[in-house]
Amino acid sequence: MGSAKSVPVTPARPPPHNKHLARVADPRSPSAGILRTPIQVESSPQPGLPAGEQLEGLKHAQDSDPRSPTLGIARTPMKTSSGDPPSPLVKQLSEVFETEDSKSNLPPEPVLPPEAPLSSELDLPLGTQLSVEEQMPPWNQTEFPSKQVFSKEEARQPTETPVASQSSDKPSRDPETPRSSGSMRNRWKPNSSKVLGRSPLTILQDDNSPGTLTLRQGKRPSPLSENVSELKEGAILGTGRLLKTGGRAWEQGQDHDKENQHFPLVES
């Protein structure tokens, strides 16, 4: 049948070795084999150190935070407020600004009402006050007469309106010029010229515009239609010699009847 010990023909391969995954504990990690930047962890403060040294170590640890995006970049130190006395220019400017602020904070001065008379006017005697009032323009006095004048003019207007309407109905004419038919005709001439203008129904023709259709443009009347009309007139009036050729009536002396000349002529 076969030997008791079976030997595979192809030698077994060793498991695949990846140099990136050699140091990884779990190769199933999604970020396996990606080299990370190592985080520098500061050592914890030792309990044997004094409190002052521990605080300094904490400050140093805060300043050199390994998680800082700008690790190792020298920063410009912040200027702390020192106790040096300010310059004289700064003192002057500060005083000016302080005075302006104090003025703006003050309440506004009370404004006197305009109707209240001034103290100087109150001190004046009655005679001087009257003289001042006389010097002032009498606005009230001028307003009352103007109102009276307007009321009088309004009263006159209704009486004048019927007279004006009567005069407007009649044509205005001078008393010197006599009224005659000739003058009336002359007066109405411009109006008649407007009426006698070109009617909108008439055809607008210019000197260059063709008045009538030429022979080429128009339809030439056929001699047959003329003969039929003449024959109708002759039959009605009973005049004219009618000829019957081939069941059709023709009039003698026509140029287009040359073909029918050999037929016998029958008088009606």
Swiss-Prot record:
Residues 117-126 have a biased composition (Low complexity). It comes from the Eukaryota. GO terms for biological process: cell division; protein ubiquitination. The keyword 4Fe-4S does not apply. The modification Phosphothreonine is found at residues 37, 76, 202, 212. A motif (KEN box) lies at residues 258-260. The modification Phosphoserine is found at residues 29, 31, 44, 64, 68, 87, 94, 199, 209. Pathway: Protein modification; protein ubiquitination. Residues 107-116 have a biased composition (Pro residues). Residues 128-149, 158-169, 178-194, 205-215 have a biased composition (Polar residues). Ubiquitinated and degraded by the APC/C-Cdh1 complex. Keywords: Cell cycle, Cell division, Cytoplasm, Mitosis, Phosphoprotein, Ubl conjugation, Ubl conjugation pathway. GO terms for cellular component: adherens junction; cytosol. It is found in: Cytoplasm, Cytosol. Residues 91-120 are annotated as: F-box-like. Residues 1-232, 247-268 are annotated as: Disordered. Residues 56-66 have a biased composition (Basic and acidic residues). The KEN box is required for the association with the APC/C-Cdh1 complex. Interacts with SKP1. Part of a SCF (SKP1-cullin-F-box) protein ligase complex. F-box-like protein which is required for entry into mitosis. Acts by participating in E3 ligase complexes that mediate the ubiquitination and degradation of WEE1 kinase at G2/M phase. This is Cell division cycle-associated protein 3. It comes from Homo sapiens.
